[in-house]
UniProtKB/Swiss-Prot annotation:
Domain of life per record: Bacteria
A single MF term (Gene Ontology): ATP binding
EC number: 6.3.2.8
Catalytic activity field: UDP-N-acetyl-alpha-D-muramate + L-alanine + ATP = UDP-N-acetyl-alpha-D-muramoyl-L-alanine + ADP + phosphate + H(+)
Name of the molecule in the record: UDP-N-acetylmuramate--L-alanine ligase
UniProt xrefs under NCBIfam families: murC
Compartments where located: Cytoplasm
Disulphide-bridged cysteine pairs: none
Single GO cellular component term: cytoplasm
General function of this protein: Cell wall formation.
Family: Belongs to the MurCDEF family.
Sequence positions that bind ATP: G112, T113, H114, G115, K116, T117, T118
Length: 465
């Protein structure tokens, strides 16, 4: 590719999905430029690596580019996209560029409605511990690497495969993981769940004859499609028919302790440095792949015991000063679908038994709030105290029956928790100051701008200290 394409421009280079690909391309020796609406830690890292980052979108930003990479979040009337069309510069979807990277190595693609980022991080960490030095592109910052991407010297590239826009069908990996299949991003599939499941079946058809689909057999929808997968299947989970199975699971001190049973292998005791049954399942996917690639059991155990997590996935910020004295434990999480939220809340209950759980939640997208409205009410009703913000629109038009006020009214009617509604995330710290008490566990949650709140709370505590 490099003899034809030397300069690659990214529209929205600071995004989680775009920045990782950009970083790998920089490290491969390409000239990389990009634009975004604001500087952040990601854009600063890319600039330090040698990328040219412009703030704001302008036609002049693509000057000299041989290709312009876009995600589905980039509008067709973006000035850089219009300029690329006018100049006949190829416009490349993000997933197509990821597919090109996968052609350079053997791809391991992690798909599923929930758990992709954590599972991708676990797979990359276990393979690294096994000496395979993988390249990885992750939708969150892997704490141990200090980045969401890395160019390794090994044969494998580990990456998330995004079903939200069906772009995972551009990928042709040699190993695939399917963590679960749930109703999300249904606009892409015409609100037809059968079409969503069919897309996952088509995803497995991208595998070569020597490839394998590593699937969570605990998920009912995944189980339904297994008979329709024509390539070799490895089942993992808690179910009796899982080929890589977790037994004797215990939660202790924020970690999960369990034994892994694998066909033809000795039982493997594991300590996972993450809470929650869902993370045990995520770890089983990594164990299944590592076992297939002959990673030593000791390396698997070490990687999982020392796993430091990934940004915004049950990320612990430590103890934060409570307004009334004492301190509360602060955790930040990217969860934005009721199933993800329930798993995180259950993990918090298991990690911190008997402690009051306070949630600050920013709903993400009006359409998701509308489509999962009752499920949101149910899961939000399981916490002890709740701060609720207005919906993060993500470019969508407001829906009056699925906004923060409507959700607050429904929660009050359900009668299990009294929500404190705030219009913006800027009001969340003050709301938590009035609500959070010594000994509480506070979780900030959502896929939108609420991700900036925990850093502010931690900074305020440091300044007071």
């Amino acid at each position: 590719m490099k003899h034809i394409v030397k300069h690659i421009h990214f529209v929205g280079i600071g995004g989680a999905g775009m920045s990782g690909i950009a970083e790998v391309l920089v490290n491969l020796g390409y000239q990389v430029s990009g634009s975004d609406l604001a500087r952040n830690a990601v854009t600063e890292r890319l600039e330090a690596l040698g990328a040219r980052v412009s703030i704001g979108h302008d036609a002049a930003n693509i000057e000299g580019a041989n290709a312009v990479v876009v995600s589905t979040a980039v509008r067709s009337d973006n000035p850089e996209v219009l300029a690329a069309r006018r100049l006949r510069v190829p416009i490349v979807p993000r997933a197509v560029m990821l597919a090109e990277l996968m052609r350079l190595k053997q791809g391991i693609a992690i798909a599923g409605t929930h758990g992709k980022t954590t599972t991708t991080s676990l797979v990359a960490s276990v393979l690294a511990a096994g000496g395979l030095d993988p390249t990885f592109v992750i939708g969150g910052r892997l704490t141990s690497a200090g980045a969401n991407a890395r160019l390794g010297t090994g044969d494998f590239i580990v990456a998330e495969a995004d079903e939200s826009d069906a772009s995972f069908l551009n990928l042709y990996p040699v190993i695939e993981v399917i963590t679960n299949i749930d109703a999300d991003h249904m606009d892409t599939y015409g609100h037809d769940f059968a079409r969503l499941k069919q897309a996952f079946i088509e995803f497995t058809q991208r595998l070569p004859f020597y490839g394998s689909a590593v699937v969570c057999i605990d998920d009912a929808n995944v189980r339904q499609i297994v008979p329709l997968i024509s390539k070799p299947v490895v089942r993992y989970g808690f179910a009796a028919d899982a080929q890589v199975r977790a037994e004797n699971v215990e939660a202790r001190d924020g970690r999960m302790h369990f034994t892994v049973r694998r066909e033809g292998r000795e039982p493997l005791p594991v300590v996972l440095n993450l809470p929650g049954l869902h993370n045990v399942q995520n770890a089983l996917a990594a164990i299944a792949i590592a076992t297939d690639l002959d990673v030593a059991d000791a390396a698997i155990q070490q990687a999982l015991a020392e796993f430091n997590g990934v940004g915004r996935r049950f990320q612990r910020y430590g103890e934060i000063a409570a307004a009334g004295g004492g301190a509360y434990t602060l955790i930040d999480d990217y969860g934005h679908h009721p199933v993800e939220m329930a798993a995180t809340i259950a993990a918090a209950r298991g990690a911190f038994p008997g402690r009051r759980l306070v949630l600050a939640f920013q709903p993400h997208r009006y359409t998701r709030t509308r489509d999962c409205f009752d499920d949101f009410v149910n899961v939000l009703s399981t916490v002890d105290a709740l701060v609720l913000t207005e919906v993060y629109a993500a470019g969508e038009a407001p829906i009056s029956t699925a906004n923060g006020d409507a959700l607050s009214r429904a929660l009050r009617a359900a009668g299990k928790v009294e929500p404190v509604f705030v219009a913006t995330v800027d009001e969340v710290p003050d709301a938590l100051a009035k609500l959070a008490r010594d000994g509480d566990v506070v979780i900030t949650m959502g896929a939108g701008s609420i991700g900036g709140v925990p850093g502010k709370l931690a900074q305020d505590t440091q300044q007071k200290g």
